[in-house]
């Protein structure tokens, strides 16, 4: 049930949907987080977004101190590789 068209990203060859899924809140509870998030619901949300045609997810190691990236990874492992969205992540902090 793909419902989104794509657009080329700048001069690259990447074709992206106009909107993606922001995964900050999926990081859950921690000092700078969004409060408790249910991982099962987060995984279902990611899978639904991909089923609807979104083809990129924004996450970062700082979102839940890596928890967001872990949940995104768990959600994507059940999606065939050819149907997986792009995952854009970033880093900036070092923590022990």
Segment roles from a protein language model:
Residues 83-96:
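A short, structured active-site edge motif that brings together acidic residues
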Residues 1-86:
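N-terminal binding-site loop/beta-alpha segment at the start of enzyme catalytic domains
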């Amino acid at each position: 049930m793909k419902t989104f068209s794509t657009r080329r990203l700048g001069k690259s060859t990447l074709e992206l949907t106009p909107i993606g899924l922001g995964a900050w809140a999926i990081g859950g509870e921690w000092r700078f987080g969004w409060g408790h998030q249910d991982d099962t619901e987060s995984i279902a949300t990611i899978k639904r977004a991909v089923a609807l045609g979104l083809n990129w997810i924004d996450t970062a190691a700082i979102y839940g101190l890596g928890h967001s990236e872990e949940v995104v990874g768990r959600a994507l492992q059940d999606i065939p590789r050819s149907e997986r969205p792009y995952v854009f992540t970033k880093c900036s902090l070092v923590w022990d």
